[in-house]
Amino acid sequence: MAQRRTSGTNLFMTVLCVVAMCRAVPINELFERASQHSDKLHSLSTTLTQELDSHFPPIGRVIMPRPAMCHTSSLQTPIDKDQALQVSESDLMSLARSLLQAWSDPLVVLSSSASTLPHPAQSTIFNKIQEMQQYSKSLKDGLDVLSSKMGSPAQAITSLPYRGGTNLGHDKITKLINFNFLLSCLRRDSHKIDSFLKVLRCRAAKMQPEMC
């Protein structure tokens, strides 16, 4: 399984490198590959959230911060597909790249915290966080190439700094709550990234909006 994931990532980056040098691959195929990566990223975050929920203390659901506290909440984004379909290609790419960039540091925090997470599935969670980091890096590199083909508006990135610190808590419950909260923010943002890239994929393939 790990070998297949690595092979898929290598193939994706190989294709993008070819495009960067000779622009031989149609952009709709590149968006298809990017969409596959974003779909996997969102799938992993969803699976991890479900994994954590299976052993999440009841008090955690009461005191966990609300979604409005996520470090990316200040970014104005479409709230559904219909709104996303009204946004330009360049702006959608800029939004996707801004969100992806905003998770570079928090993913490191999640990875570091997962290594000592007080959870029965700690090893599985840690491995999936590592996998998410790989997909995130590969997708970021791919979107950098795609945005360069779309012009300067698509290359604009809104800074969304993470100020939550590297220590998610000293006691078991606090650490689980903060870890779950950060992961829930990632799940929400990975869904946005995936949705935006699927709209871009549809447009690149010249599909009808209702097919997106």
UniProtKB/Swiss-Prot annotation:
Family matches, as InterPro entries:
4_helix_cytokine-like_core, Somatotropin/Prolactin, Somatotropin_CS
Disulfide pairs?
C70-C185, C202-C212
> Gene for this protein?
prl1
Source species, please?
A: Oreochromis mossambicus (Mozambique tilapia)
GO CC aspect terms: extracellular space
Which keywords does the record carry? Disulfide bond, Hormone, Secreted, Signal
- Know the name of this protein? Prolactin-1
Where is it localised?
Answer: Secreted
Which PROSITE patterns has this protein been placed in? Answer: SOMATOTROPIN_1, SOMATOTROPIN_2
Kindly give the PANTHER family that the UniProt entry links to this protein: PROLACTIN, SOMATOTROPIN,PROLACTIN
What the record says about family reads: Belongs to the somatotropin/prolactin family.
What domain of life does the native source organism fall in? Eukaryota
Q: Which GO terms describe its molecular function?
A: hormone activity
**What is the annotated signal peptide range for this record?**
1-24
Any single biological process term in GO? positive regulation of cell population proliferation
